[in-house]
Amino acid sequence: MFSCCFPTSRGCCFRNGGSESLFRQCRRRLIPHPRRLWPFVRRRTQVPQDSPGQALAGQATPEIPSGLPLHIVLVQEEIREPMEAQTHAPGPYADIAALAAPAVEPKPAWEEPPPERALEVEGAPAKDQPSQELPEIMAPTVATGLNAGAENVAGERSGREGVTSTAPASRSHAAPSPGHGGKHGGGDQGIQTGLLYLAGERLLSFAGTTALLLQGLFIVLILVGYISVKVMLKSIKTRLGRRVPAAPPALRRNLLLQAWKCVCNWASRLFAPNVLPRTGS
C-alpha cells in the first residue's frame, strides 16, 4: 500500500464513492507506472534486505511540494507475489493496512467523466452523504430546589426578558453609530472647506476687478480735468485779447526801442560815481 497525491486545478476535487470500476481503472493506471508522479513522489530505496517489507521497496512515497493544493489518498496495491513471508511477522506497513479505504475517490485531472456520470455525481452527494447537523446549544442548567413547574415558569420569564432585551438592541442598530457620524462629519467638514475656498477665490477676483475699474476711472477723471483746464485757459486768453487792441508791427518795433533805451539809462545811472553836492564858503 502506498499513498499518492492527485494535484488538481481547482484544489481537492471529490467524486462519489460508488464508482468502483473507475477506482480500479485509476489504480491500474497509476500502480504499474509510479514514475508518472515524478514531481510529487520519491522512492524509498533504503529498505533492509531481511525486512518483510522488501517487496514494497520499489513503491513510491508521496512528497508534497509547497504551494500546490493536494489531497493524499491511500490506494491499495495488489501484490501478485506470495505473501507467506509477511504473514509470520507484521512489517513496517502494517499500521497503514489497518486504515480503512477512503469513502470517496479523487477526480483525476487527466480524465473527464461522461455527461451522464457527471449528472449522477452532482446529484449524489446530497443523497449519499448525510448532513451533519450541529448539536443544539442548550443553556447551562442550574441545580435548584424548585419543582418542574417552577422551573418552567422561570424559563418562560427568562424568554420574555430576552425578547424585550432584543428590542432596544435593534433600535440601537437603527441609530447611527459614532463611527458613521464621524465619517459624515468629516465629509461635511470637507464640503465646508471647499465652499470657503470657493468664496475666498471669488472675493479675490472681485477685489481685483474693482481695483482695475477704479484705476480706469481715475485715468478718465485726470483726462477730463486736463481738457477742462485747457479749455478754460483758452477762453481767458480770448477775453483778454478782445479788450486790448493789438498794435501794428511798426509800433511794436518803436516800443521795443523805447524799452531798450529806458533799460540802458537806468543801468548808466546805477553804475555812475556819486557826485557830492557843493557847499558854500
UniProtKB/Swiss-Prot annotation:
Q: Name one GO cellular component term.
A: membrane
Q: Where is the composition biased (Basic and acidic residues)?
A: 108-120
Please classify the protein's predominant subcellular localization into one broad category: membrane
Comp. bias regions, Low complexity: 165-178
Keywords for the protein's UniProt record, in alphabetical order: Membrane, Transmembrane, Transmembrane helix
Region described as Disordered: spans on this chain:
107-131, 150-187
- What is this protein's name? CMT1A duplicated region transcript 15 protein-like protein
Write down the species: Homo sapiens
Name the gene behind this protein: CDRT15L2
